[in-house]
């Protein structure tokens, strides 16, 4: 099922910066928030408990990639935090992804990273030594993710349709690199607007700097949310 709230990437260096940002929003507004490596390493597990205590949904974006037993044990810990979604690298393999699923349980969604949206085809071929097209690599990882019993993948919006065709229509496609029309692209190589992401079939969209660094973050959030949901029935 599609998530009507854009997922806000909390790319902040400290707990206090997050508190200041969230204080801009009405207390009763439930947000979907992404906690990445920088914030999690700075604030620790307490940041997840804090956000959940405020009534928000949390996507813990740590991209685990290790041997199966280590990932399984880590996921058991994350399940106790009450995260709504977390992820692993599909490149870790089917056995690792199955172990992650077992450790996390079924209460939270578990998705896998295919290729980072900062990765170009030339970079993939040169540094990862994968001699296929970028799209073929993404489809391969998506199929293996589905085989492992995960809920979906992180992918570029341009890849959503082929992934759903290769897996199934309910396979979650979470797409970062979302920018409203006219916004700076930054370090993302493959970007798309919220409206285009909806039309192409994305289930979740992740938006960071266009919201967190906006002059009015609350207004920016609602503008993006309106663009994302404008054609919903």
Curated annotation (Swiss-Prot):
For this protein, what is the EC number?
4.1.1.23
Q: Its annotated pathway?
A: Pyrimidine metabolism; UMP biosynthesis via de novo pathway; UMP from orotate: step 2/2
* GO terms under cellular component: cytosol
Q: Does the keyword Protein biosynthesis apply?
A: no
Q: Does the keyword Ribosomal protein apply?
A: no
Superkingdom of origin = Bacteria
Q: Indicate which residues the UniProt annotation says bind substrate.
A: 11, 34, 61-70, 117, 179, 188, 208-209
Q: Which GO terms describe its molecular function?
A: orotidine-5'-phosphate decarboxylase activity
Q: Which CDD domains match?
A: OMP_decarboxylase_like (cd04725)
Provide the function of this protein: Catalyzes the decarboxylation of orotidine 5'-monophosphate (OMP) to uridine 5'-monophosphate (UMP).
Q: Which NCBIfam families match?
A: PRK00230.1, pyrF
Please report the name of this protein according to its UniProt entry.
Answer: Orotidine 5'-phosphate decarboxylase
| Native organism | Streptococcus pneumoniae (strain ATCC 700669 / Spain 23F-1)
């Amino acid at each position: 099922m599609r998530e009507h709230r854009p997922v806000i990437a909390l790319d902040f260096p400290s707990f206090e910066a997050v508190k200041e940002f969230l204080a801009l929003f009405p207390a009763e507004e439930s947000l979907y928030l992404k906690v990445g490596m920088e914030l999690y390493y700075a604030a620790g597990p307490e940041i997840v408990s804090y956000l959940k205590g405020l009534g928000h949904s949390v996507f813990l974006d740590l991209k685990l990639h290790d041997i199966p037993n280590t990932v399984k044990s880590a996921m058991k810990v994350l399940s106790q935090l009450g995260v709504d979604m977390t992820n692993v690298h599909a490149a870790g393999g089917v056995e690792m992804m199955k172990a992650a699923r077992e450790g996390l349980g079924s209460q939270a969604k578990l998705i896998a990273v295919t290729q980072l949206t900062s990765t170009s085809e030339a970079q993939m071929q040169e540094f990862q030594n994968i001699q296929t097209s970028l799209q073929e690599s993404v489809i391969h990882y998506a199929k293996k993710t589905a085989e492992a019993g995960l809920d979906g993948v992180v992918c570029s919006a341009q890849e959503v349709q082929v992934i759903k065709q290769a897996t199934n229509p309910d396979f979650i496609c979470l797409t970062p690199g979302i920018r409203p029309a006219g916004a700076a692209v930054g370090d993302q190589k493959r970007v798309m607007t919220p409206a285009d992401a909806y039309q192409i079939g994305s289930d979740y969209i992740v938006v960071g700097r266009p919201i967190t660094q906006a002059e009015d973050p609350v207004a920016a959030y609602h503008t993006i949310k309106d663009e994302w949901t404008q054609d919903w029935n």
